[in-house]
Amino acid sequence: MMTANKRAENQGPSLFDVVALLQDLPAHQLARGQVGTVVEQLGDETSLVEFSDDQGQAYAVAPCPRGNLLVLHYVPEAA
């Protein structure tokens, strides 16, 4: 039986999820590992992600393929 967390993982990131890039996005000067927040879903395959500095100032907003995003978790979850 698939849990809700596994279902969500298979569908990709949700709105307001914190994500990390799995590949560089050179067109937007973003490198693998940079962290952002999903701010909009642009169809089934793409999410709009906002990248901010430590003070919360956005320095990039880029459409990202959902397969290029890793959802980050800040509390323990069962694997």
Can you name each region flagged by the protein language model?
Residues 2-7, 13-78:
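Basic/aromatic-rich interaction segments and small domains that mediate binding to polyanionic partners
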